[in-house]
């Protein structure tokens, strides 16, 4: 919610007036959630929770799928609202460092997804036409934004959630990342 509030409220088209790093937004969101739930927390507990967030692990099939894509010569990348430092830590802890061609952060454009400028980072980096990109996300809102941008989209819907009630549905939906291999044939 905070990323959208910042992106929508910033009067500067370059996103420089209200922009904060995703790490700072994540910390602010944690503080808000704890306060809303009436949970007492200390800075030590907050730091411990944030450290956990920085060491995310991959879902069981992810490394195998990325290895298969690497073997096929398919370019792979992450486009994230996360800051470069967050992404570097997460990619390393998940064991994906050697399996990605690029790790792209919206930090460089100071606008969060779902702004078109954020999705343009993929096109600028790889030079592919949007329709030639298979954009994969576990977030329905992100798949919708990418669909509107013109990417071919795959929504990884692990929890069986309903699709967004506005806009076009993603072109593909699957339960886990192995669906990428099916979509690409």
List where the protein language model places each region:
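Short acidic/polar alpha-helix capping motifs at helix-coil junctions
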Residues: 26-32, 50-55, 84-86, 108-109
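Asp-based, Mg2+/Mn2+-dependent phosphohydrolase catalytic module
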Residues: 67, 83-84, 88-185
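A metal-dependent, Asp-based hydrolase signature
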Residues: 3-47
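A short, structure-level motif marking secondary-structure boundaries and short turns
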Residues: 14-17, 49-52, 71-73, 103-105, ...
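Short, acidic loop-to-helix structural element flanking the phosphoryl-transfer center
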Residues: 19, 23-24, 39-78, 88, ...
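A general structural motif at alpha-helix termini
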Residues: 1-2, 49-53, 137
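Short amphipathic alpha-helical segments at helix boundaries and their inter-helical linkers
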Residues: 6-16, 55-64, 152
